[in-house]
Amino acid sequence: FYLVMILDVYSRKIVGWEVFHAESAHHASLVIRRAVLAEGLIDQPLVLHADNGSPFKGATLLETLHALNITPSYSRPRVSNDNAFSEALFRTCKYVPGYPVNGFDSLQAAQRWVQDFVLWYNTEHRHRAIRFVTPAERHRGEDRAILAQRHALNQAAREAHPERWSGKTRN
């Protein structure tokens, strides 16, 4: 089975995904088109960064990107950190508790598992790179209020018990 996921780099939210029997530019195009529509980003200037795999360089996908005003960007050969966000996401996916180490019995089982993973990742997973808010909170713009509230709570605790604090608080 082949998983296509679209990640918003700013918020780390998975904005599109699908599991297919085969890898193809047509399948990648479907996921991108759905994500753009679901996020309300028609005619917005976007950039899609992908590896150099054939599904993301095929004519079908390039036509879709052009039609949606999306600029393609590709990883450079032999530059390991060009696709770091995607690599980190897939690592999280494969190492989350409950990942079936022996694979999936069916396409439907894979789709159900990924659906549950995406829901967890977007709405429950407190992401270290975005200061321990969820990707959905950051995507909706709620992170600033959450971080301000967290900071105020830490400041109040510090003022109430300064002996418990030896330095600055982390994010």
What kind of region is each of these model predictions?
Residues 1-171:
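Charged DNA-binding/catalytic regions of mobile-element recombinases
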